[in-house]
Amino acid sequence: MQIVHSIADLRAILSSKGRPAFVPTMGNLHDGHLSLVRAARQHGDIAVASIFVNRLQFLPHEDFDSYPRTWEADCAKLEAEGCDLLFAPREADLYPEPQTFKIQPDAQLADILEGHFRPGFFTGVCTVVMKLFSAVFFASGGGTAVFGKKDYQQLMVIRRMVEQFALPVNIVAGDTARADDGLALSSRNGYLSDDERQQAMALSLALKQLADAARAGQAPLAELEAWAMQSLAAQGWEPDYLTVRLRRDLQPPAEGAQLAGAPLVALGAARLGKTRLIDNLEF
């Protein structure tokens, strides 16, 4: 596996390697990330990953400084999975000067759910992804990027950005990797204490119960969502949201036929102790 830090070196290598399949990450890799690398190997001529902890998508009180950085372990995992090229830019490589031009995503999609509780998050995500796409796909004129469904709203926002800017990038969605008890794999799971880890699967269970109740029409959706929030709170969590949305645009479904038959997704975010977890379930 080759490792490069500068955009110029990245583009020079990729100028003769065909169509890249790209997996952007912030490092601290787990099997969820590695499953995306495995998918990338099926969708391009060269599998490229990046590791960059993007300051722009963290709020001032969030964990940018303490976010786990596990460079040597990450490199070993990527090489074992057959990643061909790792792009690991320094902050000065991606942001050589203050980033005054930023991507402002569609508010209807990006200012809800995660965007409501983490204002500016998707502006930071879209800005860094656009810069990464420019670096990775410049030489080939396009390729594939693989994003996980675990960050469902992020996947939707990136897809919309690609559509709006007519970028020559095919977005492939990778399924959420889970532990044996159903907990979605996340780099932030490492923040959980042993006791919290035993309780952490409650979020995925709450989403499953919400999805089942919503599809069965057991009560108006707002009541079911409130019940799910209360149920999780009673177990010691601090939920931000548990909600059912249309998969196509993350807007609330109408009661009745649309709720009964449309492709839906249950999404949730909640804090257990000091750790904020997110998850989702398509149904």
Curated annotation (Swiss-Prot):
Active site: 33
Nucleotide-binding listed as a keyword: yes
Gene Ontology BP, a term: pantothenate biosynthetic process
EC number(s) on file: 6.3.2.1
One Gene Ontology cellular component annotation held by this UniProt entry: cytosol
Keyword Nucleotide-binding found: yes
Subunit structure: Homodimer.
Function recorded in the entry: Catalyzes the condensation of pantoate with beta-alanine in an ATP-dependent reaction via a pantoyl-adenylate intermediate.
Top-level taxon of the source organism: Bacteria
Compartment(s) of residence: Cytoplasm
Protein name: Pantothenate synthetase
Main location: cytoplasm
Recorded family membership: Belongs to the pantothenate synthetase family.
Enzyme class name: ligase
Residues given in the record as beta-alanine binding sites: 57
Gene Ontology MF terms in the entry: ATP binding; pantoate-beta-alanine ligase activity
Pathway: Cofactor biosynthesis; (R)-pantothenate biosynthesis; (R)-pantothenate from (R)-pantoate and beta-alanine: step 1/1
Note from the entry: The reaction proceeds by a bi uni uni bi ping pong mechanism.
HAMAP family: PanC (MF_00158)
Pfam families xrefs: Pantoate_ligase
Residues given in the record as (R)-pantoate binding sites: 57, 154
Catalytic reaction annotation: (R)-pantoate + beta-alanine + ATP = (R)-pantothenate + AMP + diphosphate + H(+)
Residue positions binding ATP: 26-33, 148-151, 177, 185-188
Keyword line: ATP-binding, Cytoplasm, Ligase, Nucleotide-binding, Pantothenate biosynthesis
